[in-house]
């Protein structure tokens, strides 16, 4: 058996697994330690722990759709995670700028899928605010997804391989 000359980036799935584990551990802590819908200040005037639930997607999109949306979001997350895993298998290991965001999105997506299967909703608990302006509550899986999406966006903007060529 010959070794591939350029190992793929599937090793980055270890980061996805770590994100899933940390996400589920924090949510287990939230479910056993925080009261529902009561702010617990972390940094007064900016950050609370706030246990809440989201049956929808980002910003509670489709949260009142009647239940079918859970299966849509599970299918989307699994499909996107599968596609990104395939892309990781085609990405050389040394290309961390691509592999890192893919791994973040996979870990965050699967973390929220686990919530939907176990609870029928996603557990959120991080609440940021300034004065009376509150950002929607979120969790570590959401943070990983957003960081990964930002990474992909930055890569597409600044990576020389994807930049238009000048004559």
Curated annotation (Swiss-Prot):
Keywords: Aspartyl protease, Cell inner membrane, Cell membrane, Hydrolase, Membrane, Protease, Transmembrane, Transmembrane helix. The keyword Cell inner membrane applies. Its EC number is 3.4.23.36. InterPro entries: Peptidase_A8 (IPR001872). It comes from the Bacteria. One of its GO terms (biological process) is proteolysis. The chain crosses the membrane at residues 10-30, 68-88, 98-118, 138-158. This is Lipoprotein signal peptidase. The gene is lspA.
């Amino acid at each position: 058996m010959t070794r591939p000359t350029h190992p793929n980036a599937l090793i980055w799935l270890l980061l996805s697994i770590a994100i899933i584990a940390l996400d589920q551990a924090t949510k287990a802590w939230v479910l056993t330690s925080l009261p529902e819908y009561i702010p617990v200040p972390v940094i007064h005037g900016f950050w609370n722990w706030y246990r809440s639930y989201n049956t929808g997607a980002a910003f509670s999109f489709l949260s009142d759709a009647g239940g079918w949306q859970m299966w849509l979001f599970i299918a989307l997350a699994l499909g996107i995670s599968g596609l990104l895993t395939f892309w990781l298998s085609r990405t050389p290991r040394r290309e961390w700028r691509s592999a890192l965001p893919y791994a973040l999105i996979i870990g965050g997506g699967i973390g929220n899928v686990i919530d939907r299967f176990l609870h029928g909703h996603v557990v959120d608990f991080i609440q940021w605010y300034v004065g009376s302006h509150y950002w929607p509550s979120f969790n570590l899986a959401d943070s990983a997804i957003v960081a990964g999406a930002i990474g992909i966006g930055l890569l597409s903007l600044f990576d020389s391989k994807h930049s238009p060529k000048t004559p």
